């Protein structure tokens, strides 16, 4: 979407579900496996490093353990080592809004909370840790927070996006505007397509300035990793809202209809049925619907060919989990495009 000619050379994941999707969608990319075990000196350098260290320890929906050794979010250290060694032209880091407030550990300080060695010093937050590490290895950075509904999605998922580039550069300004998105054919293979139009993408990008996209619409709850469970869970930062798998069992979308229609228009794709029947014949949240809510191409994570050997229940659960951990592609593209063009404004 941002740089359609870019080639994905490496990925790094160890979970079976995401690994299956990555292998199918990026068949020529090498999965380097456990990021903590990679010797980056043996890996051929690349132009762009993009990642989002696991968010569960930063998310308001998680246990808020923070970014420190022994936590999943602490995997940022491995990403930072990759950046330090490979020296890419552009770094993109994405995470939950909790990165703005979750505590962090830094090798620059003796403690895990206050800076400056005293109890009254400022608290180091996860985003501050990332910025400090990047500065320490010679990278400047710009960042923003963007909600999925700011680009027209029917839910409010907020994400922090950061771009960084070698210090002293004026910025890694992209020469391309939004390209065509990628969608899948009948066999679920990715190829060039038109899931999101250039006009729609650029139109919703302008909402960054107004901050009004979605302001007048009632939004669906954000997909979460808990949606596969019977009772689901609340969306991040929306503890008083019902879980998505409860809302979709309502006979009519009612107040949510305008938000759904808007996303259908932007993606050029009709919303799938929001529920499917369980083995017991009861309606339950459809993983095809959450895939659509996240703005993913049809079949990107739900194509049955990906899940050979999985039961229907297991397939649904792994897809809901991936959607709950994911980010809307148009949301990410809008944020990256905005940040990489700040110096040109």
Predicted regions and their residues:
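C-terminal target-recognition/interaction regions appended to catalytic cores
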Residues: 187-191, 195-345
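SAM cofactor-binding core of SAM-dependent methyltransferases
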Residues: 1-38
């Amino acid at each position: 979407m941002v740089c359609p000619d870019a080639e994905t050379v490496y990925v790094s994941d160890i979970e079976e579900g995401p690994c299956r999707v990555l292998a199918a969608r990026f068949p020529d990319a090498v999965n380097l496996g456990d990021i903590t075990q990679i010797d980056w000196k043996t890996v051929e350098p690349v132009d762009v490093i993009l990642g989002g260290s696991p968010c569960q320890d930063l998310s308001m929906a998680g246990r808020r353990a923070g970014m420190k050794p022994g936590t999943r979010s602490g995997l940022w250290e491995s990403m930072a080592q990759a950046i330090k060694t490979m020296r890419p032209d552009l770094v993109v880091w994405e995470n939950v809004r909790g990165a703005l407030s979750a505590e962090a550990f830094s090798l620059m300080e003796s403690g895990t909370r206050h800076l400056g060695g005293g109890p009254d010093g400022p608290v180091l937050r996860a985003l501050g840790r990332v910025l400090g590490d990047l500065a320490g290895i010679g990278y400047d950075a710009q960042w923003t927070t963007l909600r999925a509904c700011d680009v027209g999605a029917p839910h409010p998922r907020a994400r922090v996006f950061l771009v960084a580039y070698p210090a002293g550069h004026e910025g890694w300004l992209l020469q391309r505007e939004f390209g065509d998105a990628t969608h899948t054919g009948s066999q679920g293979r990715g190829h060039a397509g038109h899931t999101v139009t250039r006009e729609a993408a650029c139109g919703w990008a302008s909402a960054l300035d107004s901050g009004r996209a979605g302001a007048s619409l009632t939004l669906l709850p954000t997909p979460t990793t808990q949606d596969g469970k019977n009772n689901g869970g609340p969306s991040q930062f929306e503890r008083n809202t019902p879980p998505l798998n409860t809302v979709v069992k309502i006979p009519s979308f009612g107040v949510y209809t305008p938000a759904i229609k808007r996303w259908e228009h932007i993606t050029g794709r009709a919303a799938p049925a929001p529920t499917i029947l369980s083995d017991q014949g009861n309606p339950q949240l459809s993983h095809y619907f959450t895939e659509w809510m996240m703005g993913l191409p049809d079949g990107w994570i739900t194509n049955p060919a990906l899940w050979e050997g999985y039961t229907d229940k297991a397939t649904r659960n792994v897809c809901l989990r991936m959607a709950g951990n994911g980010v809307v592609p148009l949301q990410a593209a809008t944020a990256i495009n905005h940040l990489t063009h700040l110096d040109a404004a």
